[in-house]
Amino acid sequence: MDRRDAMALSGSGSYYIQRGIPGSGPPPPQTQPTFHGSQGFHHFTNSISPFGSNPNPNPNPGGVSTGFVSPPLPVDSSPADSSAAAAGALVAPPSGDTSVKRKRGRPRKYGQDGGSVSLALSPSISNVSPNSNKRGRGRPPGSGKKQRLSSIGEMMPSSTGMSFTPHVIVVSIGEDIASKVISFSHQGPRAICVLSASGAVSTATLLQPAPSHGTIIYEGLFELISLSTSYLNTTDNDYPNRTGSLAVSLASPDGRVIGGGIGGPLIAASQVQVIVGSFIWAIPKGKIKKREETSEDVQDTDALENNNDNTAATSPPVPQQSQNIVQTPVGIWSTGSRSMDMHHPHMDIDLMRG
Protein backbone atom coordinates (compact mmCIF):
# COMPACT_ATOMS: atom_id res chain seq x y z
CA MET A 1 0.00 0.00 0.00
CA ASP A 2 1.35 3.38 -0.98
CA ARG A 3 2.22 5.87 1.80
CA ARG A 4 0.12 8.61 0.26
CA ASP A 5 -2.81 6.24 -0.12
CA ALA A 6 -2.46 5.21 3.51
CA MET A 7 -2.42 8.83 4.75
CA ALA A 8 -5.33 9.84 2.53
CA LEU A 9 -8.35 8.82 4.59
CA SER A 10 -11.96 8.86 3.60
CA GLY A 11 -12.64 11.81 5.90
CA SER A 12 -9.87 14.07 4.52
CA GLY A 13 -10.88 16.88 2.21
CA SER A 14 -9.39 17.35 -1.21
CA TYR A 15 -8.42 20.69 -2.70
CA TYR A 16 -7.95 21.59 -6.32
CA ILE A 17 -7.10 24.66 -8.33
CA GLN A 18 -9.82 25.99 -10.57
CA ARG A 19 -8.57 27.22 -13.91
CA GLY A 20 -10.38 28.91 -16.66
CA ILE A 21 -10.73 27.23 -20.09
CA PRO A 22 -9.08 29.38 -22.74
CA GLY A 23 -11.13 30.29 -25.75
CA SER A 24 -14.50 29.70 -24.06
CA GLY A 25 -15.47 33.35 -23.95
CA PRO A 26 -14.20 36.70 -22.80
CA PRO A 27 -11.28 36.43 -20.46
CA PRO A 28 -12.31 36.61 -16.81
CA PRO A 29 -10.73 39.22 -14.53
CA GLN A 30 -7.36 38.28 -13.25
CA THR A 31 -7.71 36.87 -9.79
CA GLN A 32 -5.47 34.89 -7.58
CA PRO A 33 -6.00 31.15 -7.53
CA THR A 34 -8.30 30.09 -4.75
CA PHE A 35 -8.56 26.79 -2.97
CA HIS A 36 -11.92 25.16 -2.77
CA GLY A 37 -12.68 22.35 -0.45
CA SER A 38 -15.15 19.65 -1.43
CA GLN A 39 -18.21 19.56 0.73
CA GLY A 40 -18.68 15.77 0.26
CA PHE A 41 -15.29 14.59 1.55
CA HIS A 42 -14.54 12.53 -1.59
CA HIS A 43 -11.12 11.04 -2.18
CA PHE A 44 -9.38 11.14 -5.55
CA THR A 45 -6.75 8.61 -6.40
CA ASN A 46 -3.34 9.66 -7.55
CA SER A 47 -4.04 8.79 -11.17
CA ILE A 48 -2.74 11.01 -13.93
CA SER A 49 -5.07 11.31 -16.82
CA PRO A 50 -3.59 12.23 -20.18
CA PHE A 51 -4.09 15.73 -21.42
CA GLY A 52 -6.23 16.10 -24.47
CA SER A 53 -5.01 18.17 -27.37
CA ASN A 54 -6.78 19.82 -30.20
CA PRO A 55 -6.03 17.96 -33.46
CA ASN A 56 -6.44 21.12 -35.46
CA PRO A 57 -3.54 23.37 -34.52
CA ASN A 58 -4.84 26.25 -36.58
CA PRO A 59 -7.37 28.61 -35.09
CA ASN A 60 -11.06 28.18 -35.86
CA PRO A 61 -11.99 30.05 -39.01
CA GLY A 62 -15.20 31.13 -37.31
CA GLY A 63 -13.23 33.19 -34.81
CA VAL A 64 -13.72 30.81 -31.85
CA SER A 65 -10.42 29.82 -30.42
CA THR A 66 -9.88 26.44 -28.82
CA GLY A 67 -7.13 25.38 -26.47
CA PHE A 68 -6.01 22.69 -24.15
CA VAL A 69 -8.58 21.48 -21.67
CA SER A 70 -7.11 19.99 -18.53
CA PRO A 71 -9.03 18.21 -15.85
CA PRO A 72 -8.65 19.40 -12.27
CA LEU A 73 -5.45 18.24 -10.71
CA PRO A 74 -5.76 16.34 -7.46
CA VAL A 75 -3.66 17.76 -4.64
CA ASP A 76 -2.52 15.38 -1.97
CA SER A 77 -1.94 17.06 1.33
CA SER A 78 -0.69 15.85 4.64
CA PRO A 79 -2.86 16.04 7.75
CA ALA A 80 -0.78 18.99 9.04
CA ASP A 81 -1.22 20.90 5.79
CA SER A 82 -4.93 20.17 5.66
CA SER A 83 -5.48 21.28 9.26
CA ALA A 84 -3.47 24.49 8.67
CA ALA A 85 -5.44 25.27 5.52
CA ALA A 86 -8.73 24.60 7.27
CA ALA A 87 -7.72 26.86 10.14
CA GLY A 88 -6.72 29.60 7.71
CA ALA A 89 -10.01 29.30 5.86
CA LEU A 90 -12.18 29.35 8.98
CA VAL A 91 -10.32 31.97 11.09
CA ALA A 92 -10.29 35.51 9.65
CA PRO A 93 -7.36 37.79 10.44
CA PRO A 94 -8.12 40.41 13.08
CA SER A 95 -8.76 43.87 11.68
CA GLY A 96 -6.58 46.80 12.75
CA ASP A 97 -9.62 48.92 13.66
CA THR A 98 -10.61 46.77 16.62
CA SER A 99 -10.04 48.66 19.88
CA VAL A 100 -8.00 47.07 22.62
CA LYS A 101 -10.02 46.47 25.76
CA ARG A 102 -8.71 48.14 28.86
CA LYS A 103 -7.86 45.77 31.62
CA ARG A 104 -9.56 46.13 34.95
CA GLY A 105 -7.74 46.86 38.15
CA ARG A 106 -4.83 49.08 39.10
CA PRO A 107 -2.53 50.05 36.20
CA ARG A 108 0.90 48.52 35.99
CA LYS A 109 3.83 50.18 37.65
CA TYR A 110 5.97 49.71 34.58
CA GLY A 111 5.04 50.70 31.06
CA GLN A 112 4.95 48.51 27.96
CA ASP A 113 8.51 49.36 27.03
CA GLY A 114 9.78 48.15 30.38
CA GLY A 115 10.81 51.58 31.58
CA SER A 116 9.77 52.68 35.01
CA VAL A 117 7.10 55.30 35.32
CA SER A 118 8.18 58.35 37.29
CA LEU A 119 6.14 58.72 40.45
CA ALA A 120 7.46 62.17 41.36
CA LEU A 121 4.82 64.82 41.85
CA SER A 122 5.19 67.89 39.64
CA PRO A 123 4.60 71.22 41.38
CA SER A 124 1.29 72.84 40.54
CA ILE A 125 1.33 76.03 38.48
CA SER A 126 -0.89 77.89 40.93
CA ASN A 127 1.47 77.32 43.86
CA VAL A 128 4.67 78.31 42.06
CA SER A 129 4.84 82.03 41.32
CA PRO A 130 7.48 83.32 38.84
CA ASN A 131 8.31 86.34 40.89
CA SER A 132 8.17 85.10 44.53
CA ASN A 133 10.32 87.66 46.32
CA LYS A 134 10.49 87.48 50.10
CA ARG A 135 9.27 90.52 51.94
CA GLY A 136 11.86 92.16 54.12
CA ARG A 137 11.48 92.04 57.85
CA GLY A 138 10.27 95.08 59.71
CA ARG A 139 8.30 98.09 58.62
CA PRO A 140 8.82 99.24 55.03
CA PRO A 141 10.72 102.51 54.56
CA GLY A 142 8.65 105.67 54.58
CA SER A 143 5.78 104.26 56.66
CA GLY A 144 6.99 105.53 60.02
CA LYS A 145 6.87 109.01 61.47
CA LYS A 146 7.29 111.93 59.14
CA GLN A 147 10.89 112.99 58.86
CA ARG A 148 12.04 116.55 59.09
CA LEU A 149 13.13 118.28 55.95
CA SER A 150 16.43 120.09 55.63
CA SER A 151 16.78 123.45 57.30
CA ILE A 152 15.70 126.46 55.21
CA GLY A 153 17.56 129.40 56.70
CA GLU A 154 17.54 130.83 60.20
CA MET A 155 13.89 131.96 60.11
CA MET A 156 12.62 128.47 59.32
CA PRO A 157 14.96 125.96 60.98
CA SER A 158 12.50 123.06 60.78
CA SER A 159 9.97 123.65 58.01
CA THR A 160 7.84 120.67 57.00
CA GLY A 161 4.70 122.09 55.37
CA MET A 162 2.39 119.54 57.00
CA SER A 163 -1.41 119.63 57.13
CA PHE A 164 -2.02 121.80 54.07
CA THR A 165 -5.61 123.11 54.01
CA PRO A 166 -7.29 125.29 51.32
CA HIS A 167 -9.64 128.15 52.21
CA VAL A 168 -11.92 130.48 50.24
CA ILE A 169 -12.20 134.14 51.27
CA VAL A 170 -15.16 136.05 49.80
CA VAL A 171 -14.78 139.84 49.63
CA SER A 172 -17.91 141.91 49.04
CA ILE A 173 -18.17 145.11 46.98
CA GLY A 174 -16.47 148.10 48.67
CA GLU A 175 -14.39 145.98 51.09
CA ASP A 176 -10.61 146.01 51.32
CA ILE A 177 -9.13 142.83 49.88
CA ALA A 178 -5.72 143.29 51.53
CA SER A 179 -7.16 143.80 55.01
CA LYS A 180 -9.33 140.69 54.63
CA VAL A 181 -6.32 138.53 53.80
CA ILE A 182 -4.21 139.99 56.61
CA SER A 183 -6.96 139.50 59.20
CA PHE A 184 -7.34 135.89 58.09
CA SER A 185 -3.61 135.28 58.58
CA HIS A 186 -3.84 136.45 62.22
CA GLN A 187 -6.46 133.87 63.19
CA GLY A 188 -3.94 131.23 64.15
CA PRO A 189 -0.29 130.12 64.10
CA ARG A 190 -0.60 128.60 60.65
CA ALA A 191 1.23 130.10 57.72
CA ILE A 192 -0.84 131.13 54.70
CA CYS A 193 -0.27 131.69 51.02
CA VAL A 194 -2.61 133.04 48.33
CA LEU A 195 -3.13 130.62 45.47
CA SER A 196 -5.47 132.57 43.17
CA ALA A 197 -7.95 135.47 43.07
CA SER A 198 -10.69 136.61 40.68
CA GLY A 199 -12.84 139.74 40.48
CA ALA A 200 -12.70 143.50 39.76
CA VAL A 201 -10.97 146.30 41.66
CA SER A 202 -12.04 149.97 41.76
CA THR A 203 -9.16 151.45 43.76
CA ALA A 204 -5.58 150.17 44.10
CA THR A 205 -2.76 151.67 46.15
CA LEU A 206 0.63 150.43 44.91
CA LEU A 207 4.13 151.03 46.17
CA GLN A 208 6.60 152.95 44.04
CA PRO A 209 10.10 151.61 43.33
CA ALA A 210 12.77 151.67 46.04
CA PRO A 211 14.35 155.14 45.53
CA SER A 212 11.14 157.14 46.09
CA HIS A 213 9.41 154.90 48.71
CA GLY A 214 6.03 156.44 47.90
CA THR A 215 2.63 155.13 46.88
CA ILE A 216 0.52 155.60 43.76
CA ILE A 217 -3.28 155.41 43.83
CA TYR A 218 -5.09 154.06 40.76
CA GLU A 219 -8.83 154.62 40.42
CA GLY A 220 -11.09 153.10 37.82
CA LEU A 221 -12.26 149.65 36.83
CA PHE A 222 -9.45 147.12 36.83
CA GLU A 223 -9.60 143.40 36.32
CA LEU A 224 -7.78 141.35 38.92
CA ILE A 225 -5.16 139.21 37.14
CA SER A 226 -3.26 137.77 40.10
CA LEU A 227 -2.83 138.22 43.80
CA SER A 228 0.11 136.69 45.62
CA THR A 229 1.26 136.80 49.18
CA SER A 230 2.66 134.68 52.01
CA TYR A 231 2.60 135.35 55.75
CA LEU A 232 4.89 133.41 58.05
CA ASN A 233 5.49 133.56 61.80
CA THR A 234 8.94 134.77 62.80
CA THR A 235 8.75 133.32 66.35
CA ASP A 236 6.64 130.62 67.93
CA ASN A 237 3.38 131.59 69.66
CA ASP A 238 3.69 135.16 68.41
CA TYR A 239 0.83 135.61 65.98
CA PRO A 240 1.07 139.39 65.26
CA ASN A 241 4.77 139.15 64.47
CA ARG A 242 4.67 137.98 60.87
CA THR A 243 6.65 138.53 57.74
CA GLY A 244 5.23 138.86 54.26
CA SER A 245 3.70 141.26 51.76
CA LEU A 246 0.96 141.40 49.15
CA ALA A 247 1.53 141.85 45.41
CA VAL A 248 -1.13 142.36 42.75
CA SER A 249 -1.40 142.57 38.96
CA LEU A 250 -4.29 144.51 37.35
CA ALA A 251 -5.49 145.05 33.78
CA SER A 252 -7.08 148.37 32.72
CA PRO A 253 -9.97 148.59 30.19
CA ASP A 254 -7.62 150.01 27.53
CA GLY A 255 -5.35 146.93 27.74
CA ARG A 256 -2.62 148.28 30.00
CA VAL A 257 -1.26 146.11 32.82
CA ILE A 258 -0.18 147.63 36.11
CA GLY A 259 1.08 145.93 39.20
CA GLY A 260 3.35 145.96 42.20
CA GLY A 261 3.38 145.67 45.94
CA ILE A 262 0.25 146.75 47.78
CA GLY A 263 0.90 149.78 50.00
CA GLY A 264 -2.68 150.69 50.92
CA PRO A 265 -6.30 149.73 50.47
CA LEU A 266 -7.35 147.49 47.59
CA ILE A 267 -11.10 148.12 47.18
CA ALA A 268 -13.21 145.53 45.42
CA ALA A 269 -15.52 146.72 42.60
CA SER A 270 -17.32 143.34 42.47
CA GLN A 271 -17.45 140.21 44.52
CA VAL A 272 -13.91 138.85 44.77
CA GLN A 273 -12.96 135.27 45.64
CA VAL A 274 -9.51 134.62 47.08
CA ILE A 275 -8.21 131.02 47.41
CA VAL A 276 -5.85 130.75 50.37
CA GLY A 277 -3.87 127.76 51.64
CA SER A 278 -2.76 127.34 55.25
CA PHE A 279 -0.15 124.92 56.59
CA ILE A 280 2.03 124.22 59.61
CA TRP A 281 5.56 125.23 58.85
CA ALA A 282 7.31 125.06 62.27
CA ILE A 283 7.92 122.43 64.99
CA PRO A 284 8.08 123.33 68.69
CA LYS A 285 11.58 123.91 69.99
CA GLY A 286 11.32 121.20 72.64
CA LYS A 287 11.01 118.47 70.03
CA ILE A 288 13.83 119.99 68.02
CA LYS A 289 16.14 120.02 71.03
CA LYS A 290 15.30 116.42 71.91
CA ARG A 291 15.99 115.27 68.37
CA GLU A 292 19.22 117.23 68.24
CA GLU A 293 20.36 115.71 71.56
CA THR A 294 19.58 112.21 70.38
CA SER A 295 21.43 112.83 67.12
CA GLU A 296 24.44 114.17 69.06
CA ASP A 297 24.42 111.11 71.34
CA VAL A 298 24.38 108.85 68.32
CA GLN A 299 27.28 110.75 66.78
CA ASP A 300 29.26 110.51 70.05
CA THR A 301 28.73 106.76 70.29
CA ASP A 302 29.76 106.36 66.65
CA ALA A 303 32.89 108.40 67.26
CA LEU A 304 33.79 106.30 70.32
CA GLU A 305 33.34 103.09 68.38
CA ASN A 306 35.52 104.41 65.57
CA ASN A 307 38.23 105.44 68.04
CA ASN A 308 38.15 102.02 69.69
CA ASP A 309 38.49 100.35 66.32
CA ASN A 310 41.42 102.59 65.39
CA THR A 311 43.25 101.95 68.68
CA ALA A 312 42.69 98.22 68.34
CA ALA A 313 44.09 98.31 64.82
CA THR A 314 47.17 100.45 65.65
CA SER A 315 48.15 98.92 69.04
CA PRO A 316 51.07 96.43 68.86
CA PRO A 317 50.38 92.81 69.77
CA VAL A 318 50.99 91.83 73.40
CA PRO A 319 53.65 89.09 73.74
CA GLN A 320 52.59 85.93 75.52
CA GLN A 321 54.29 85.17 78.81
CA SER A 322 54.20 81.41 78.36
CA GLN A 323 56.62 81.53 75.43
CA ASN A 324 59.95 83.31 75.24
CA ILE A 325 61.42 82.69 71.79
CA VAL A 326 64.47 84.60 70.59
CA GLN A 327 65.44 84.42 66.94
CA THR A 328 69.20 83.83 66.49
CA PRO A 329 71.31 83.28 63.42
CA VAL A 330 72.18 79.72 62.43
CA GLY A 331 75.28 78.23 64.07
CA ILE A 332 75.37 80.63 67.05
CA TRP A 333 74.34 79.60 70.53
CA SER A 334 72.31 82.12 72.46
CA THR A 335 71.67 82.54 76.12
CA GLY A 336 67.98 83.00 75.64
CA SER A 337 67.31 79.57 77.11
CA ARG A 338 68.43 80.81 80.51
CA SER A 339 65.41 83.05 80.73
CA MET A 340 63.27 79.96 80.30
CA ASP A 341 65.04 78.39 83.30
CA MET A 342 64.37 81.55 85.28
CA HIS A 343 60.68 81.46 84.46
CA HIS A 344 60.52 77.78 85.42
CA PRO A 345 62.82 77.30 88.45
CA HIS A 346 61.36 73.89 89.30
CA MET A 347 62.20 72.42 85.91
CA ASP A 348 65.13 69.95 86.06
CA ILE A 349 66.51 68.60 82.81
CA ASP A 350 68.87 65.62 82.96
CA LEU A 351 70.59 64.98 79.65
CA MET A 352 72.02 61.61 80.85
CA ARG A 353 68.58 60.02 80.93
CA GLY A 354 67.60 58.03 77.87
Curated annotation (Swiss-Prot):
The entry's keywords: DNA-binding, Nucleus, Repeat, Transcription, Transcription regulation
Transmembrane region(s): none
DNA-binding region boundaries: 101-113, 134-146
Location of the PPC domain: 159-302
Region Disordered: start-end pairs: 1-158, 290-354
Biased composition (Basic and acidic residues): 340-354
Compositional bias per record (Polar residues), positions renumbered to this chain: 304-327
Skewed-composition ranges (Low complexity): 46-55, 75-96, 122-133
InterPro entries: AHL, AT_hook_DNA-bd_motif, PPC_dom
Main localization, broad class: nucleus
Subcellular location(s) of the protein: Nucleus
GO molecular function: minor groove of adenine-thymine-rich DNA binding
UniProt biased composition (Acidic residues): 294-303
Keyword Transcription regulation appears in the UniProt entry: yes
One term under GO cellular component: nucleus
Residue ranges annotated as motif Bipartite nuclear localization signal: 101-109
Described purpose of this protein according to its UniProt entry: Transcription factor that specifically binds AT-rich DNA sequences related to the nuclear matrix attachment regions (MARs).
Domain characteristics, as noted in the entry: The PPC domain mediates interactions between AHL proteins.
Name the record gives this protein: AT-hook motif nuclear-localized protein 11
Organism: Arabidopsis thaliana (Mouse-ear cress)
Classification lineage: Eukaryota, Viridiplantae, Streptophyta, Embryophyta, Tracheophyta
